[in-house]
Amino acid sequence: VEDAAPIFHPMPPGRSGDLWRLSLPGHEESWVVKQPRQHLRVAADWQVSTERAGIEALFLETMAARALTPVPELIGFDPTTRLLVIRHQAAPAWHPWSRLLQSGRIDPGHARTLGLALGRIHAGTRDDPALLERFAAEDLLRDLRIRPLLHVTAGAHPDLAGELELREEELGNGPRTLIHGDPDPSNLLLDGAGTGLLLDGECACRGAPHLDLALAQSHLLLAWAGQPRRAGAWLTAVRTLTDAWRTRMDADGTGMVERATRLLPALLLAAVDGLAPDPGLTAERRGRLRSFARTQLRVAPDRADLLLRRFERAMGDID
């Protein structure tokens, strides 16, 4: 119906922007309209340029053009209003991975899907300086990741400032690829066959690939802290994600996993004392995570399995 008025249905907003589902009378399909906020919805004063909407549009275009990993179809982007429109992937066909994890469905196949997706992006862009220059958004990387995760955490733990500075240096002195920047389980949609769609590319930029891996691992460990009696399933999920990613990175994989392992305690500490602490953590879990992360930052282990076993012991008897 060409002259039908569009209907905007408000969707639950994220902390970084507003969302609407757009439908047209007489049309079965629908679309999602996104608009970023400069002031993120967190208790602290967290401001980030809304130019990141253009980065997300570029990310979606790049993924589709290069067939690196499935993403929602980009319908359009308006650089003036920063409105971005993508095709809506509706339930019951698609589910956020985070919702499946919360329901107790810890499927290593889903972890493998995310690991492979990130690995394909990293391996497929590391030798393309022209593409990486288009994603040279160091200011956004600083405002979205470095400051909230490392700088603010260092301010809360001045005795660990040196260790956190070393983690930041490792992010700056290694290989560069295109990174997603926010590989949260809520940003992976899964269908019944296990096919995944990677969402929310507004944090994408030229950066260190081990940051993506460590972020993905940290989200699983934080979910593990909420379901500690499923330790075996969580261990398998984190290992599967890591191994799937490593297989895509060839000779660089092992060294990057070691870097991710050294960064991981910093990200866990940021979930407690960074700019936007994880609201789902109880006081006891915050205390356990803080103690664990502080100790591991000083030890700086580079063996992922060793760190996971220590995490299991630290979280094992939380009710």
Language model regions located:
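Active-site acidic catalytic loop and adjacent metal/ATP-binding pocket
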Residues: H9-V33, L166-L211
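Active-site activation/catalytic loop segments of kinase-like enzymes and analogous catalytic loops
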Residues: L58, H210-D250, L264-A283
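ATP-binding pocket architecture of kinase catalytic cores
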Residues: M11, S16-A130
